Amino acid sequence: MNNELRIIISGGGTGGHIFPAVSIANAIKAKRPDAKILFVGALGRMEMQRVPAAGYEIKGLPICGFDRKHLLKNIAVLFKIWKSQHMAKSIIKNFKPMAAVGVGGYASGPTLNVCASKGIPCLIQEQNSYAGVTNKLLAKKAEKICVAYEGMERFFPADKIIMTGNPVRQNVLETTITPEEARKQFGLDPEKKTIVLVGGSLGARTINESVLQHLDLVKESGVQFIWQTGKYYNAAIMEQLKGQELPMLKVTDFISDMGAAYKAADLVISRAGASSISEFCLIGKPVILVPSPNVAEDHQTKNAMALVNKDAAIYVKDADAPEVLLKKAVDTVKDEAKLASLCENIKKLGLKNSADVIADEVIKLATK
């Protein structure tokens, strides 16, 4: 028991927090197969399904964020924070972690606060170019802060920062099939130019609208499309497409093999979440970024501009997307020189082995 490595990993809410968390856990297990890893997430959020599916145990806290529009609702939020703090104490008392990792998201607040108060060393991993509220609050208590962008000393003590990049999904990096094989896998012409549209794990209304408003261009472009609508929008979209002949358009609510989808793509259209951007950098994939306006501190636009300012991506404003996005994508995918330039520049920004580097830091903290 005493020699077992016991690590808590906390946070979640979106795929952008969960994928790095699972990657870090996998890297720790690869280095220390004896490690016991416990996740702590927020009840009702995506991590409660995704983490067990990845093979790890998770405990849920009844926590949520503050409602900035309906202030009276925050009385209930304060109670949930208090209750989550008490539950976190019980979880930590029973599990006895030797180190804690926070990846952002509501649950990491009470979990790492309790760990720090008990002298358990903490590491936080900030995926974005603009630090999240939870991580900013935890920074004083963390011993190490792993980041993916330059200039993060604006938010965190410089002596704690380690530039690691963001851990990404291994299946995205390890796909060995050719682009032609990948297109065949999706039932498409192996030789035709292909655009992949993804709106994050929840879907993106404006990206979806950009296709629905320009179906004539889809039909006439000579380009084929793999379109992840998101579960929330899928039924309505399928109803709108009913009866139309669209063999060049493969529509799905969720792409399970994203590695194959990216391999099939000559160009990707995506939100500007930090994890997605890290994947595009590592695989060298030309991308048009449409940052979500519905995120804290407009951090997705800041993520996108870090690439756009280095000619490593194309930016389309969310409000403009329904009108201009699809034409810009079709024009770009037919411009070989532009694709080659985007590919070359985005590759320069990729930081490899991020999960391994972070796992090493966690193990050091746990065993010092």
Q: Where are the predicted features?
A:
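Active-site-proximal region of nucleotide-activated glycan assembly enzymes
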Residues: 46, 57, 116-180, 188
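Acidic donor-binding loop of glycosyltransferase active sites
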Residues: 97-99, 263-277, 285-286
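Glycosyltransferases and closely related glycan-assembly transferases
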Residues: 87-101, 108-123, 136-144
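C-terminal alpha-helical cap of glycosyltransferases
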Residues: 352-368
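Structural loop-to-beta junction motif characteristic of Rossmann-like glycosyltransferase folds
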Residues: 56, 120-121, 266-267, 284-292, ...
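Conserved nucleotide-sugar phosphate-binding/catalytic loop shared by glycosyltransferases and other
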Residues: 4-12, 30-80, 85, 231-233, ...
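A short, well-ordered alpha-helix in the C-terminal region of glycosyltransferases
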Residues: 338-352
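Donor-nucleotide binding loops and adjacent catalytic segments primarily
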Residues: 45, 50, 54, 177-184, ...
